[in-house]
UniProtKB/Swiss-Prot annotation:
Its EC number is 3.5.1.5. Carboxylation allows a single lysine to coordinate two nickel ions. It is found in: Cytoplasm. It is an enzyme of class 3 (hydrolase). Keywords: Cytoplasm, Hydrolase, Metal-binding, Nickel. The active site is at residue 320. It catalyses: urea + 2 H2O + H(+) = hydrogencarbonate + 2 NH4(+). NCBIfam families: PRK13206.1, PRK13207.1, urease_alph. Ni(2+) 1 binds at residues 134, 136, 217, 360. Pathway: Nitrogen metabolism; urea degradation; CO(2) and NH(3) from urea (urease route): step 1/1. This is Urease subunit alpha.
Length: 567
């Protein structure tokens, strides 16, 4: 076989096994673990290239070929960092493997025919669409902002810019749940709604799940008492949905130990588990040690920087309807903001003790920065802590898998949607984000939603080619008209499906049902299942694991930041 240099090969077909790629302007380097495209048989589209009739394109009809192939992609997912072609059919991932013409090429698992479109992913990174599980539905425009950042699934609650929604992620009651499901039918992302879990009458909670909510949110602003926690979890066990918890900062109804006793070993998703976003002061962070607790962070405290503390007080006062002229309100806000626990949070992510990242959109968090901030934490931890013990070789592959899992597969597992989304695997909805390595985690090159391009940077519409400035993100055909309904999912509960809620509401989008929410445990959080022996000093707020102080230094400079947003 004729040979070319490794550099020439990478320029033509993208990096291959053993090549390394830098992620944006971070200190993170990934190494290609395997290449499934078969040397000498690679497919590529273009003038004089391979995907032509009788060459890389076969003679089969649409029934026997894929609708879309992403060629020579470098996949970064929880299961590996692999070069492969990705085939998509009927809006779902058909296979990850070798694309081409099976009549003349060996090892083809993704047949290309006249019905096949091509996205050229040579030299590009492909990840699964992000999943944000902490959405305050304050305004519908959040969906567009999230989508252009690489997030394709949004889970949360709310009804618009009402005081309740500004503070809590709850869509309260069957009437609002119905209206929000109808409104979400027009959004270009997958959605799932959380009902209000603050209630001691189980029927008031059951009716919300039966109306279409995929989970319940318990929030201290509505009263996170042991009674409401127990009631919500009892209904959850009965109806197979998840419960999300923002616990009692003021410790009015009990301490963290009382909340854990009310949870009683049942699975629960704890929001902003560090505590600045809310939760038992100062030691809600210790909840991450328990096998039934699925701990997440919201992004205002990620990563820890020299500005983190200063910006939090004003954010908190606005979001939780507090009055700066009332001393008790100020004291409440200040009790949630602790340098010591914030400094420990990044480390807890790096060792896999915190399992998920999310936004807290417009309610202290930034909906378009889940992915950016997750990778900024990964960078900061490499700079401060060096290579992880789990790494093999001179690369950051394990760290990359750990961090990508925090906003893809682990939120999917937590909320019972991993059978539909959350990874680049056959059978799942083709929600795929294509990145140029230099812009990884910051600005996607293409966002594929349900097998069709939904959003992409696009140049002057009157130009002779697609690239002249001004270039900015624009909605594409996959997010327009009835195509939007065909390429997105609305998640509902099993009870709502049995009640034919989508038919009653005349929803046009594809429907998916959540399942397995009650059996998932911390150990199931991929690369993020550590259950440390963690303590917090009640006076100094210092965090320790097995007696060792856990802390980090605040950053004064970050990658993936201003240099990317000058244009």
């Amino acid at each position: 076989m004729a040979e070319i240099s490794r550099q020439a090969y990478a320029d033509m077909f993208g990096p291959t096994t053993g090549d390394k790629v830098r992620l944006a302007d971070t200190d993170l380097w990934i190494e290609v673990e395997n290449d499934l495209t078969i040397y000498g048989e690679e497919v590529k589209f273009g003038g004089g290239k391979v995907i032509r009739d009788g060459m890389g394109q076969g003679q089969m009809t649409a029934q026997d070929c894929v609708d879309l192939v992403l060629t020579n992609a470098l996949i970064v997912d929880h299961w590996g960092i692999v070069k492969a072609d990705i085939g998509v059919k009927d809006g779902r991932i058909f296979a990850v493997g070798k694309a081409g013409n099976p009549d003349i090429q060996p090892g083809v698992t993704i047949p290309i025919g006249a019905a096949t479109e091509v996205i050229a992913a040579e030299g590009k990174i492909v990840t699964a669409g992000g999943i944000d599980t902490h959405i305050h539905w304050i305004c519908p425009q959040q969906a567009e902002e999230a989508l252009v950042s690489g997030v394709t699934t949004m889970i949360g609650g709310g009804t618009g810019p009402a005081a309740g929604t500004n503070a809590t992620t709850c869509t309260p009651g069957p009437w609002y749940i119905a209206r929000m499901l109808q409104a979400a039918d027009t959004l270009p992302v997958n959605i799932g709604l959380l009902g209000k879990g603050n209630g001691s009458n189980p029927d008031a909670l059951r009716e919300q799940i039966a109306a279409g909510a995929i989970g319940l949110k318990i929030h201290e602003d509505w009263g996170s008492t042991p009674a409401t926690i127990n009631c919500s979890l009892s209904v959850a066990e009965e109806m197979d949905i998840q419960v999300a918890l923002h616990s009692d900062t003021l410790n009015e109804a009990g301490f963290v130990e009382d909340t854990l006793a009310a949870i009683d070993g049942r699975t629960i998703h704890t929001f902003h588990t560090e505590g600045a976003g809310g939760g038992h002061a100062p030691d809600i962070i210790t909840a991450c040690a328990h096998p039934n607790i699925l701990p997440s962070s919201t992004n205002p405290t990620l990563p820890y920087t020299v500005n983190t503390i200063d910006e939090h007080l004003d954010m908190l006062m606005v979001c939780h309807h507090l009055d700066p002229d009332i001393a008790e309100d100020v004291a409440f806000a200040e009790s949630r903001i602790r340098r010591e626990t914030i400094a420990a949070e990044d480390v807890l992510h790096d060792i896999g003790a915190f399992s998920l990242t999310s936004s807290d959109s417009q309610a202290m968090g930034r909906v378009g920065e889940v992915i950016i901030r997750t990778w900024q934490v990964a960078h900061r931890m490499k700079v401060q802590r060096g290579a992880l013990a789990e790494e093999s070789g001179d690369n950051d592959n394990f760290r990359a898998k750990r961090y990508v899992a925090k906003y893809t597969i682990n939120p999917a597992l937590t909320h019972g949607i991993a059978h539909e989304v959350g990874s680049v695997e056959a059978g799942k909805l083709a929600d795929l984000v294509v990145w140029s390595p230099a812009f990884f985690g910051v600005k996607p090159a293409t966002i594929v939603k349900g097998g069709m391009i939904a959003c992409a940077p696009m140049g002057d519409i009157n130009a002779s080619i697609p690239t002249p400035q001004p270039v900015h993100y624009r909605p594409m055909f996959g997010s327009l008209g009835a195509a939007r309904h065909a390429t997105r999912l609305t998640f509902i509960s099993q009870a709502a499906d049995a009640n034919r809620i989508p038919q009653q509401l005349n929803l046009q989008s594809a429907i998916a049902v959540v399942k397995g929410c009650r059996t998932v445990k911390k150990a199931d959080m991929i690369h993020n299942g550590l259950q440390p022996n963690i303590t917090v000093d009640a006076q100094t707020y210092e965090v320790r694991i097995d007696g060792e102080l856990i802390t980090s230094e605040p950053a004064d400079v970050l990658p993936m930041a201003q240099r990317y947003f000058l244009f």
